[in-house]
Amino acid sequence: MPPLVIADLGAGEGTISQMMAQKAKRVIAIDNSEKMVEFGSELTKKHGIDNLEYRLGELEDVPIRSGAVDLAFLSQALHHASHPERAVAEAWRILKPGGRIAILDLNRHHFEQARELYADLWLGFTEIEIEKFLKGAGFRNVETAIVHREQEAPYLETVLATGEK
């Protein structure tokens, strides 16, 4: 697989961004927390990672030019977006033709404490909801699957969704 330009949308401190940077051509990590962007940038310098850049930004208004990336990746980020369908549309915008999106997020659940504990705006999404977001933005070859089930309460499940521009 050729080295890709990857956008990690909702990157947090960038643990996954740093892992992807080991094989990617370039990774752009986006987060709306100035603290996370500063922390991630410091880790990048400390570890000498020169193909990873952190930027402050919102999932619904990504500071990346249109058609610039090969892969848009959102891991446990979509449930923090005020308008998740707009976040998916932004991922579409920044992708090159033929680019792909990969979303890992919580399946719909009823663990209300997540709103207070983790600032979750949404209590996950069904596979059908995520599929609608992707198809509504224009993605094709959309696939979804439950890829993880917690064995302890609150028994959260993780959905993987992919699509192609």
Where are the model-predicted features located?
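Class I SAM-dependent methyltransferase SAM/SAH-binding core
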Residues: 5-8, 12-61
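A short acidic, Gly/Pro-enriched loop at the edge of an enzyme's catalytic core
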Residues: 60-71
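A short SAM/SAH-binding and catalytic strip from SAM-dependent methyltransferases
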Residues: 70-83
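Short N-terminal helix/helix-N-cap motif within the alpha/beta-hydrolase-1
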Residues: 82-86, 111
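A short glycine-rich, Lys/Arg-flanked "PGG" loop and its adjoining helix->strand segment in the class I
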Residues: 85-100
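C-terminal alpha-helical "lid/dimerization" subdomain adjacent to the S-adenosyl-L-methionine
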Residues: 100-157, 162
